[in-house]
Curated annotation (Swiss-Prot):
It comes from the Bacteria. GO terms for molecular function: translation elongation factor activity. Pathway: Protein biosynthesis; polypeptide chain elongation. CDD domains: S1_EF-P_repeat_1, S1_EF-P_repeat_2. SUPFAM superfamilies: Nucleic acid-binding proteins, Translation proteins SH3-like domain. The gene is efp. NCBIfam families: efp, PRK00529.1. Belongs to the elongation factor P family. This is Elongation factor P. Gene3D superfamilies: 2.30.30.30, Nucleic acid-binding proteins (2.40.50.140). InterPro entries: Elong-fact-P_C (IPR015365), NA-bd_OB-fold (IPR012340), Rib_uL2_dom2 (IPR014722), Transl_elong_fac_P/YeiP (IPR020599), Transl_elong_KOW-like (IPR013185), Transl_elong_P/YeiP_cen (IPR001059), Transl_elong_P/YeiP_CS (IPR013852), Transl_elongation_fac_P (IPR011768). It is found in: Cytoplasm. It comes from Methylacidiphilum infernorum (isolate V4).
Length: 186
């Protein structure tokens, strides 16, 4: 389906120069006395490379439909992460470059959404928050509680975040996947 470039938003998939691309960001610009244009940050799904492209606001682009599949993270195999569809038991091997920062929040059997455009994996969507175990946290020093003092803690995935002083090793904490910050005890 062809639509105006100005109607395309973040998270949608388009076909650009024959390649399937995921829209990472869109900006509408109207410089001085020039025509308005739409600037998009796109990621080519075949190469994994991101680039910036400009379109006139009336230019037509081919919009692709995204299919969402609920899967579970299974294991890591070299530089790939393997996800499984719990209904069909199909597995999907995803390169580390595509997983990106999401790897800091993945643990075995973690539910995630895989987005497909024309049977090509487009993106990985994590839940808003995940529950992870603290594997290393230094003890808080007595008298440090005058204000909201935080200390570093290492989680089971290797992610290091700031947590309140009362969090101890072995506890479960709720972490925001968008900001990578401590939310609460689990």
């Amino acid at each position: 389906m062809f639509v105006n470039a100005s109607d395309v938003g973040k998270g949608q998939a388009i076909r650009h120069n024959g390649a399937i691309c995921l829209v990472l960001e869109t900006m509408h610009r109207t410089p001085g006395n020039l025509r308005a244009f739409v600037q998009m940050v796109l990621r080519n799904l075949k190469t994994g490379k991101s680039f910036v492209e400009r379109f006139g606001s009336q230019d037509k682009v081919e919009l692709l439909s995204l299919v969402r599949k609920r899967c579970e993270y299974s294991y890591r195999e070299g530089n790939n992460f393997v996800f499984m569809d719990p209904e069909t038991y199909d597995t999907f091997s995803v390169p580390e470059e595509m997983v990106g920062k999401a790897k800091d929040f993945l643990k075995e059997n973690q539910p995630v959404d895989l987005l497909f455009a024309d049977d090509t994996l487009a993106a990985i969507e994590l839940p808003q928050s995940v529950i992870l175990k603290v594997v290393e946290a230094p003890e808080g020093v007595k008298g440090d509680s005058a204000t909201n003092v935080m200390k570093p803690a290492i989680l089971e995935t290797g992610l290091c975040i700031q947590v309140p002083l009362f969090i101890k090793e072995g506890e479960l904490v709720k972490v925001s996947t968008t900001e990578g910050k401590y939310l609460s005890r689990a």
